[in-house]
Amino acid sequence: MLDFTEASLKKVLTRYNVALEKALTPEEAAEELYPKDELIYPIAKAIFEGEEDDVVEGLQAAIEAGKDPIDLIDDALMVGMGVVIRLYDEGVIFLPNVMMSADAMLEGIEYCKENSGATPKTKGTVVCHVAEGDVHDIGKNIVTALLRANGYNVVDLGRDVPAEEVLAAVQKEKPIMLTGTALMTTTMYAFKEVNDMLLENGIKIPFACGGGAVNQDFVSQFALGVYGEEAADAPKIADAIIAGTTDVTELREKFHKH
């Protein structure tokens, strides 16, 4: 007769050197990642918790203690958001958590700007949109929040954006990257039209595409397409671009799964 008692299972796990570990809560997992600096810690924690008032309170205390407001964007706000993104990537927290944290991050950035008298340097500009005919913008909103939280200037064109408007925005803003999201299979073909318009006008920037209707095979069919499986891939692709990987083929090698 098979013995499925706890004691028996422990013996099996011990035999095969498998540790019985209690899963960490999201809060416990985050606690292990927070910086130890007593002024930075409460800010990073408030970012993770999505508490805008606590973020501002922590920033105020840090500034009064002599921290530079602009430096706090990288040293505290970005650090806190880094914890959020890491735990999201690991499946510990979910998209609503990321959105709340991104809002808290943006509130913190505004507070730092107001108290410095200077405008923090952005990494670069990214134009974002939802495919023409598609009104589902939750994915796009997450992408824009993550890009802003990671130091990018985002030009958000909204949802149901005609290809001509996308082209005009790219020509005006000269971004390092364009993003597009689509939830409906009937709308994702607009990305090919955008791609062709860009090429016809001599524009060869990476076009990161994602969303429920989109897959890697589809995005790989057009010249500028780079597939982002998750919203969190957007800032990673942008970071790769500003680090020097601007060739679409190289970006695909880095981010595509097959």
From Swiss-Prot:
InterPro entries: Cbl-bd_cap, Cobalamin-bd, Cobalamin-bd_sf, Corrinoid_p, Met_Synthase/Corrinoid, Meth_synthase_dom. Methylcob(III)alamin binds at residue 136. One of its GO terms (biological process) is homocysteine metabolic process. Changing residue 136 to G/K: Abolishes cobalamin-binding. GO terms for molecular function: cobalamin binding; cobalt ion binding; methionine synthase activity. Residues 30-124 form the B12-binding N-terminal domain. Residues 123-248 form the B12-binding domain. SUPFAM superfamilies: Cobalamin (vitamin B12)-binding domain, Methionine synthase domain. Harbors a corrinoid prosthetic group and acts as a methyl group carrier in methanogenesis in the methanol pathway. The methyl group of methanol is first transferred to the corrinoid prosthetic group of MtaC in the cob(I)amide oxidation state. This reaction is mediated by MtaB. The methyl group from MtaC is then transferred to coenzyme M by MtaA. Belongs to the methylamine corrinoid protein family. This is Methanol--corrinoid protein. It comes from Methanosarcina barkeri (strain Fusaro / DSM 804). The lineage of its organism: Archaea, Methanobacteriati, Methanobacteriota, Stenosarchaea group, Methanomicrobia.
